[in-house]
């Protein structure tokens, strides 16, 4: 039997180190991080009755009281021994990373042109709260191109390459919806305009069913159902079919533009 102490942010509701009662334990295992400083050294006084082991740690100063207080130190790197692979690699190998979807996320609080029909601030909270409960790897999506900012794509090709690597896009923005479908990636779109605005219109133009109106954003069952559908084989096929379908309306617009020049 063992207990694992977590950061309160990483595992809300889990056991925190400050809450662990030292008298209940025979051993203390400190995993990962540098064995250095007062916080680590304080463990030796708190858990004085336990056999204390440090594993997968960095040892900077072997004479540091934080180090010498352990009964056994199994370092990942130290001047006294060759480096070994970090324990995190073993945790990754034991999990199934392919089962966790990568989700591009693009929300907006702008679009003042919609005036009193705007519900942008009202829909963002429910979306982000709902997303926080999803086991996914979220990726913020920004279509603004800037060759001077390493955090942004410098070319349209780079942004489309990013989109193509996603499993799903969650968005309240027209261009993220359109570009996701153009890349064959399912999109869960929420229209932040009461009664429907340009996001709803774009979904209709693509014949795309993955849309939630602003009035239903608090319906987590609807969000969950669309999330599951987007990540299903059916949802992926629908997005790929939308991407491959010829757009005669767009061609008509381009022809009209050329004719008007």
Residue ranges of each PLM-predicted region?
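Active-site anion-handling motifs in enzyme catalytic cores
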Residues: 1-261
